[in-house]
């Protein structure tokens, strides 16, 4: 399952150089010190396995989501002329992009691009020249394939230029707004002056480009080859989780495939140690999952479970419940009833065959780590706590006082067992309560907490209260703010796809103001890397941490 170099990626290899057809999803070089999941590191490992020298020279790079040709030198004899050719801009490079909108006639695009800020490059009249030849290869409706020959090498140059002329690259999570099975940009041609002649390399266009032109917006999950390729890209995107820097505490539970963000909106796949959970989001009838299950089973999991998620079924009867979330695995062997998984070295219990939920929300992994880091000696209120994973993180971090609240008794009993089974020092309470009714009572009793964590469902209903994410956050934030100790923090999180982070923060600040409190610090976090953003939409999960005066 761990990403490895595939020899099929090699276009040509000699004693002096190697040309690789990089797949989408793989970084060219390490993005963080100690990581070994990028193409350069994987290629070096492959050469060592062959008993060959692993020294390679890197002369160019492609964005992680761009596929195509990369040339590496293997000897100093080759490195010097290849490096000189790239530095002198004597190398001819050609790309093909799948775009949505009218790219216009064949022409030269001329822009000035500013410096990269907050991950984005923008057109800036005071920026540096960006020049690209554009040639239209094919058009079908509002879609087109275009060939691009850049004459300059600015960061994100092709992506920004195409977006600016009204034809953004499909699947581009930063500059596009149109879904696709991946970002449709491929380096197809490379011509390098070398040894008195030239090296010429070409790469065939991946099949998803033609499928895009024919109207595809997501991978067909019944096509085993297409889905397997899509899943492989998703695994490479998560290379940092499979191969973290040496000495990193163990994390063996995370999302392997995230719906639209990885190219198939009907499918999500989670890893729980040696087991997998497949989520099928079904709008109309049951999905045909044979190809997905076969691809998943080939990864080497001991077993895999299925959760069918249907919008129209909120509280299914027992028979329907078993059909949606079978207790038995759909392949392999059954997991223990209570399985121990790990995040950043902390153990959490989960139940893979016990209904639609497992006992932990994996998209909150990094927020649990953050809470762990600020918990020593502190008090923590965990609202809408489910099975208490945030409380576990706080207690493991050294919190001395916690209160864990949820309306579901089974969830609270699981939280109690998970927390108290660690024999923590301090006082740790658990309440089966309607959060909305409890908050005023806590305020009247004068209870205060250093950290208040609130992560409600997008829609919640109790006997006396209804909550709908949006403006209802104002009242909830006001009630929570009154329970935060001066200098403490409100940790608010939502997976409401309708709200962007700024709108979410505005609701929170209005609530805090209504409570007569002020904000003296803020941090905003998006989802972790295994929950990639959907092009054109806000991140699905948003967390705002506000320090309150």
Indicate where each model-derived feature is located.
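Mobile active-site "lid"/loop adjacent to the S-adenosyl-L-methionine
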Residues: 411, 432, 449-479, 485
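RNA pseudouridine synthases
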Residues: 1-219
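C-terminal catalytic and target-recognition region of SAM-dependent MTase-like enzymes
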Residues: 489-549
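Non-catalytic accessory regions of SAM-dependent methyltransferases
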Residues: 183, 205-275
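Non-catalytic substrate-recognition/targeting regions of SAM-dependent transferases
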Residues: 259-263, 270, 286-361, 369
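Conserved SAM-binding motif I beta-strand of class I
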Residues: 401-406
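S-adenosyl-L-methionine
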Residues: 410-451
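Conserved SAM-binding loop of SAM-dependent methyltransferases across substrates and taxa
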Residues: 387-399
């Amino acid at each position: 399952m761990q990403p490895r170099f595939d020899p099929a990626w090699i276009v040509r290899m000699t004693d002096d150089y190697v040309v690789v057809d990089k797949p989408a999803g793989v970084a060219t070089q390490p993005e963080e010190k100690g990581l070994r999941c990028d193409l350069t590191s994987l290629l070096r490992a492959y050469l060592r396995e062959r008993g060959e020298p692993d020294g390679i020279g890197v002369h160019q790079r492609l964005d992680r989501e761009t596929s195509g040709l990369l040339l590496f030198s293997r000897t100093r004899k080759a490195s010097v002329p290849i490096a000189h050719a790239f530095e002198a801009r004597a190398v001819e490079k050609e790309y093909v992009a799948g775009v949505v909108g009218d790219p216009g006639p064949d022409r030269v695009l001329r822009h000035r691009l500013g410096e990269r800020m907050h991950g984005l490059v923008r057109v800036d009249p005071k920026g540096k020249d960006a020049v690209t030849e554009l040639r239209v290869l094919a058009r079908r409706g509002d879609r087109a394939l275009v060939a691009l020959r850049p004459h300059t090498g600015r960061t994100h140059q092709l992506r920004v230029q195409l977006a600016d002329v009204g034809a953004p690259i499909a699947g581009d999570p930063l500059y596009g707004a149109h879904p696709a099975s991946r970002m449709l940009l491929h380096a197809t041609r490379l011509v390098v002056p070398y040894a008195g002649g030239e090296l010429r390399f070409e790469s065939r266009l991946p099949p998803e480009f033609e499928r895009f032109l024919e109207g595809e917006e997501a991978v067909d999950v019944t096509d085993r080859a297409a889905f397997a390729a899509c899943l492989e890209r998703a695994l490479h995107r998560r290379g940092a989780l499979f191969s973290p820097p040496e000495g990193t505490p163990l994390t063996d539970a995370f999302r392997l495939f995230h719906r639209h963000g990885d190219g198939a909106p009907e499918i999500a796949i989670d890893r729980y140690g040696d087991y997998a959970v497949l989520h099928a989001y079904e709008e109309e009838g049951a999905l045909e999952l044979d190809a997905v299950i076969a691809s998943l089973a080939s990864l080497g999991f001991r077993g895999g479970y299925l959760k069918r998620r249907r919008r129209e079924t909120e509280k299914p009867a027992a028979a329907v419940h078993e059909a949606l979330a079978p207790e038995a695995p759909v392949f392999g062997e059954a997991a223990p009833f209570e399985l121990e998984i790990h995040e950043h070295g902390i153990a959490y219990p989960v139940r893979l065959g016990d209904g639609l939920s497992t006992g932990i929300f994996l998209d909150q992994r990094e927020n649990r780590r953050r809470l762990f880091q600020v918990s020593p000696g502190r008090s923590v209120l965990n609202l809408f706590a489910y099975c208490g994973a945030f409380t576990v993180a706080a207690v493991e971090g050294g919190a001395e006082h916690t209160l864990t609240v949820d309306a579901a008794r089974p969830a609270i009993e699981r939280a109690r067992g998970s927390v108290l089974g660690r024999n923590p020092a301090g006082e740790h309470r658990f309440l089966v309560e309607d959060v909305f009714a409890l908050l005023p009572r806590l305020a009247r009793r004068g209870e205060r907490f250093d950290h208040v964590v609130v992560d409600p469902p997008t829609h919640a209903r109790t006997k006396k209260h209804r909550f709908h994410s949006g403006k209802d956050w104002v009242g909830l934030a006001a009630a929570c703010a009154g329970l935060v100790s001066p200098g403490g923090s409100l940790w608010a999180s939502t997976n409401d796809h309708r709200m962007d982070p700024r709108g979410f923060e505005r609701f929170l600040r209005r609530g805090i103001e209504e409570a007569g409190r002020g904000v003296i610090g803020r941090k905003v976090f998006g989802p972790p890397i295994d929950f990639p953003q959907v092009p054109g939409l806000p991140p699905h999960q948003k967390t705002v941490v506000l320090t309150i005066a």
